[in-house]
Amino acid sequence: IKYISSYGEFKIGLLPMVYNTLKSWGVEDIKITDKRIIPNIEPIIPTQLGANYNPIKLYPRQIQAIKTLLNNKVGDTPFLICAGDYSVGFGKTLLFCALYKAYQGNLPTILLLNDSDLFNQFKREIPELLPNEDIAFIQGSKCNRWGKFNVAMVQSISKNIRQYQQNLLDIRMVLIDEADIIDNKTYQTVISYLYNSFIRIGLSGTIYMNERKNG
């Protein structure tokens, strides 16, 4: 499989692998230059979500998970294209909402799902976790509006990519459920239109399980 083109280009998600490979070859002077225009917003990790009269507090392990994701680096360079592997019951819904809230709701965000049952579950849960936020749910080809926090079925976006491509250009943070299947064609189609995003974080409970299975 050819990961690097004849021009020396590779997909940005492969940067950690390329960096580690160069290090294993004994290359020491590796310089990473990020020329993307990134808003100067310092993340503040919330300790609770929901309404003030009925707050839902994050557990210390959830707060630590968010810190780990938001402090991800390649070498000494911040690199917020990463994935976290968390067991079932860890609270992925809370993590997704907390990641959005960490940037004070200032980053247009899309949460990509591939399961309709989970979509309906999030449709019930997320508004309670993010009251007063501009939330939109996108399924099928009929979508009248996008919000600041968009929960979308990846199949719907992929099938209607021309209809939604302008909306995707506005997205700055991409959150992905079941990150272990991100390399399938449907996800890749959508992600190829999300090139203005500088944060891409996936969560899964099976990443390393699949690696062990394939090993």
Where are these regions (language model features)?
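Accessory, non-ATPase domains that flank or precede helicase/AAA+ motor cores in DNA-metabolism machines
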Residues: I1-W25
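Conserved pre-motif I regulatory segment
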Residues: K2-S5, T21, I30-A83
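Walker A/P-loop
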Residues: K73-K101
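Conserved helix-turn-beta segment of the N-terminal RecA-like "Helicase ATP-binding" lobe
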Residues: Q104-G105, T109, S116-K142
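Loop/turn-to-beta-strand initiation segments
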Residues: L107-P108, W146-V151, D170-M173, N196-G202
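Inter-Walker segment of RecA-like/P-loop motor cores
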Residues: P127-Q166
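Conserved RecA-like ASCE ATPase "motif II neighborhood" in helicase/translocase motors
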Residues: N150-V190
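Post-DEXD/H (motif II) to motif III coupling segment of the RecA-like Helicase ATP-binding lobe
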Residues: M173, E178-G215
